[in-house]
């Protein structure tokens, strides 16, 4: 090493060697966050050179970065002039300012080593191929000198690559290790830009056949396929494929948030995050869908939305083959196979597969509902629920069923509806084998086996297996009946009660028996009717073993064993309850006046005389439960 330092034939590493370059096509493939990160890193490199006392030029790249412009130049501009500041000047054989700046001014790593060793000679001897082995070694002290400033380290299996250094040192190391030549801005008419090096060599990825013009770019790209992540965080052990990702990640541990919003004071650890946040204040939505015209604030949301039109689902589960549009959805799904429940509630000990589920659950303990609807003031525990609710006000229903044309405001509702047409019942109970179309119904059914009733009324302590029953029950205490019929003014405490009632006025009978075609107003009537076709008799008399299709028929039959009269003398003059036998509609129509009965014996005679007619009308006429 000492011999290398005293060799008079030396070469300095130029700024072009530590600069990441993009073609116009490559630049177009970067999103806004990646472009912003690129600008920040390159300007940070320049600032580092200045802080070390190194002369830094202001070529076209730096000028574009400082002004937020794209860091590529048109070929027409390159063929006319050359370096910035030379416009209008005749060609000369003398080196230009740009040439001197690039070839002589930036000897960053040479000067960095000089400052550490005190040696006045810079650079390394250059062999016929452009680099010697000693030159690679010559850069090592410069890399090692940055070691203390970095938050991470190299994974042991990648020790040969050196330490996880700053962005500058990493770029230089890539170039030296991969054998790229050092380029200087050495001519005006060559048509080569110091930013875009149009090299004859083309490097192709064997996995995906993507083409790169530099070997280091290919090597960095190949990490995607190989999964190599040489940069490891010393705090949590997480690994990254690039040193820049490690630097960004380290701010999670330090809590550093240097980028502050001037509008609301919110701080961020990345400038790209601040830029995205500022669009909330400005209302800017630069990403517009060409299919439906919908605009988005963030590119990632825009890309995800586009997949709803194309149907693309790039994330496929290796276990079951199910595909997903986005990575978070895939990760959430994969936990189903692993059976892992890593998130535990400290209040009740309940465990969850996802952090979002835990946070949502914890709000049941705190009662916090931070997301409020600006239209109606209704509050929600999570933002997704608010977004889900807000569609009610807009009336938008973009998801239409191709089978029947019915439209829905959420994709999940459409998928759930389509199971009616397909007959799919993916949720099967392991206890009794019963299958269900919807997950919510399946969970509710399982509580019938376990006896779990997690929803408790604070007024009376009564518990329920589902939230809907608790809400319906609570209206008993409040007496509230917000749903009023516009036809007759009758009020109900449930929307479903109003809907069922309105069918009396409209005559609608949406429930049809597939066996005989008979229609009914309510689903309960259809279920009760279906037993006629199936012959099912689930209600059995414990005395004689006789079975009945309805509980009311069993109750009526059991009076034959008990000898209890349908109406006793003491019952006359007060309303009937659900536990008592109701007065038959046939008897009311025939004008039988039970209020004139004076003895219990007379009632028994009345019952015997109408026993036959009761059986005739029992199947066709409903019974009045109260008068």
From Swiss-Prot:
This is Zinc finger protein 805. Belongs to the krueppel C2H2-type zinc-finger protein family. May be involved in transcriptional regulation. GO terms for biological process: regulation of transcription by RNA polymerase II. Residues 13-84 form the KRAB domain. The gene is ZNF805. A zinc finger (C2H2-type) spans 203-225, 231-253, 259-281, 287-309, 315-337, 343-365, 371-393, 399-421, 427-449, 455-477, 483-505, 511-533, 539-561. Keywords: DNA-binding, Metal-binding, Nucleus, Repeat, Transcription, Transcription regulation, Zinc, Zinc-finger. One of its GO terms (cellular component) is nucleus. One of its GO terms (molecular function) is DNA-binding transcription factor activity, RNA polymerase II-specific. It is found in: Nucleus. SMART domains: KRAB (SM00349), ZnF_C2H2 (SM00355). Residues 135-160 have a biased composition (Basic and acidic residues). Residues 113-123 have a biased composition (Polar residues). Residues 71-95, 113-162 are annotated as: Disordered. The keyword Repeat applies. InterPro entries: KRAB, KRAB_dom_sf, Znf_C2H2_sf, Znf_C2H2_type. SUPFAM superfamilies: beta-beta-alpha zinc fingers, KRAB domain (Kruppel-associated box).
């Amino acid at each position: 090493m000492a011999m290398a330092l005293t060799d008079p034939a030396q070469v300095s590493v130029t700024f072009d060697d530590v600069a990441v370059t993009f073609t116009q096509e490559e630049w177009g493939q970067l999103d806004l966050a990646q472009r912003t990160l690129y600008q920040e890193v390159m300007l940070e490199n320049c600032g580092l050179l200045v802080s070390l006392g190194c002369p830094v030029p202001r070529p076209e790249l730096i000028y574009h970065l400082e002004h937020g412009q794209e860091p590529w130049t048109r070929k027409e501009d390159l063929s006319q002039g050359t370096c910035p500041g030379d416009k209008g000047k005749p060609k000369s054989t003398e080196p230009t300012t740009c040439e001197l700046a690039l070839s002589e001014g930036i000897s960053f790593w040479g000067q960095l080593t000089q400052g550490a060793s005190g040696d006045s000679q810079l650079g390394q001897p250059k062999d016929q191929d452009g680099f010697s082995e000693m030159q690679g070694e010559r850069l090592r002290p410069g890399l090692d000198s940055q070691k203390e400033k970095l938050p991470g380290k190299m994974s042991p299996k990648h020790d040969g690559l050196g330490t996880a250094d700053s962005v500058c040192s990493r770029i230089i190391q890539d170039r030296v290790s991969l054998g790229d030549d050092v380029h200087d801005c050495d001519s005006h008419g060559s048509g080569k830009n110091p930013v875009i090096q149009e090299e004859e060599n083309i490097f192709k990825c064997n996995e995906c056949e993507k083409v790169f013009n530099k070997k280091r770019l290919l090597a960095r790209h190949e990490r995607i396929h190989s999964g190599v992540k040489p940069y490891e965080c010393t705090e949590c052990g997480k690994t990254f494929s690039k040193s820049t990702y490690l630097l960004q990640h380290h701010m999670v541990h330090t809590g550093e948030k240097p980028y502050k919003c001037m509008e609301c004071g919110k701080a961020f650890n990345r400038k790209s995050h601040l830029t995205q946040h500022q669009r909330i204040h400005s209302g800017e939505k630069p990403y517009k869908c060409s299919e439906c015209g919908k605009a988005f604030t963030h590119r990632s949301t825009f890309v995800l939305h586009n997949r709803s039109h194309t149907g693309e689902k790039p994330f496929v589960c290796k276990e079951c083959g199910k595909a997903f549009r986005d990575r978070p959805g895939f990760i959430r799904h994969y936990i189903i196979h692993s059976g892992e429940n890593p998130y535990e509630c400290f209040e009740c000990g309940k465990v969850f597969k996802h952090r979002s589920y835990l946070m949502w659950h914890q709000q049941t303990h705190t009662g916090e509902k931070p997301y409020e609807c600006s239209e109606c003031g209704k509050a929600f525990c999570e933002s997704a629920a608010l977004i889900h609710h807000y569609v009610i006000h807009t009336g938008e229903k973009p998801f239409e069923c191709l089978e029947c044309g019915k439209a829905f405001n959420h994709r999940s509702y459409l998928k759930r509806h389509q199971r009616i047409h397909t007959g799919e019942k993916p949720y099967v109970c392991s206890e009794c084998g019963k299958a269900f179309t919807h997950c919510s119904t399946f969970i509710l059914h399982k509580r019938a086996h376990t006896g779990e009733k997690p929803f408790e009324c604070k007024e009376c302590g009564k518990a329920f297996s589902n939230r809907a029953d608790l809400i319906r029950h609570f209206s008993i205490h409040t007496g509230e009946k917000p749903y009023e019929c516009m036809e007759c003014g009758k009020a109900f405490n449930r929307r479903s009660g109003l809907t069922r009632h309105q069918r009396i006025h409209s005559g609608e009978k949406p429930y049809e028996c597939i066996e005989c075609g008979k229609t009914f107003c309510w689903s309960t009537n259809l279920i009760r009717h279906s037993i006629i076709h199936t012959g099912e008799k689930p209600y059995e008399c414990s005395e004689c073993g006789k079975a009945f299709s309805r509980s009311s028929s069993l109750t009526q039959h059991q009076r034959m064993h008990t000898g209890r009269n349908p109406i006793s003398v003491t019952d006359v003059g007060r309303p009937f309850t659900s536990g008592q036998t109701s007065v038959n509609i046939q008897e009311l129509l025939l004008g039988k006046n039970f209020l004139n009965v004076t003895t219990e014996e007379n009632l028994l005679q009345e019952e015997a005389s109408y026993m036959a007619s009761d059986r005739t009308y029992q199947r066709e006429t409903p019974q009045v439960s109260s008068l």
